């Protein structure tokens, strides 16, 4: 039996959360994770360069037949866990139901606050500042048919400071929460999958 869970990371942009996983892997902190594949929904996503530099198989899939091609790739590479890391496409309920408790997303707020339809990227941080909350953070959760509605795996809080702009807050949430939380959550789920194999 394999002592690794094979992981695919789905990206649409610069790949900062992908890089956090790559860095933790290189540091030996993810002993049950094999990063087998990076898939981008955008041709020029910076995350593809990060995968290239790390020697990880990477591919761009265009809009046409995206999910069918993705499913074929995941099966070909025997993927156990799918990680959404700055991935901006909405996956269909048919796709999500194929991989119960195997798709992981990181969201830049403490769910159930500032989540769901329309809350992504900078908009999440704008909403937190507009509302006047004193604490925000990040959540890693399983993906189900409800946007940001799956079971929570881990959360980390981040203080909001006087003078924060959405951009400053976004950066702090990434550095203090997302980049720490996501790799640890992927390792946790991977270890559970390996343990279930016996």
Q: Each predicted region: which residue ranges?
A:
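One-carbon transfer enzymes
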Residues: 1-198
């Amino acid at each position: 039996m394999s002592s690794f869970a094979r992981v695919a990371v789905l990206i649409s942009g610069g790949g900062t959360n992908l890089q956090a996983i790559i860095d933790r892997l290189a540091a030996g902190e993810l002993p049950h994770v094999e990063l087998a594949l990076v898939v981008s929904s955008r041709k020029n996503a910076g995350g593809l360069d990060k995968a290239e530099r790390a020697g990880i198989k990477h591919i761009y899939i265009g809009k046409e037949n995206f999910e069918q091609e993705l499913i074929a790739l995941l099966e070909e590479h025997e993927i156990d866990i799918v990680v959404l890391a700055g991935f901006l496409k909405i996956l269909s309920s048919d796709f999500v139901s194929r991989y119960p408790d195997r798709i992981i997303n990181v969201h830049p707020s403490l769910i159930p606050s500032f989540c769901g339809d329309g809350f992504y990227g900078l908009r999440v941080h704008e909403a937190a500042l507009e509302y006047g909350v004193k604490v925000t953070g990040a959540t890693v959760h399983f993906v189900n048919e409800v946007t940001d509605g799956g079971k929570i795996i881990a959360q980390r809080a981040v203080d909001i400071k006087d003078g924060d702009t959405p951009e400053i807050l976004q950066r702090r949430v990434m550095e203090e929460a997302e980049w720490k939380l996501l790799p640890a959550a992927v390792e946790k789920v991977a270890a559970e999958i390996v343990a279930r194999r016996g």
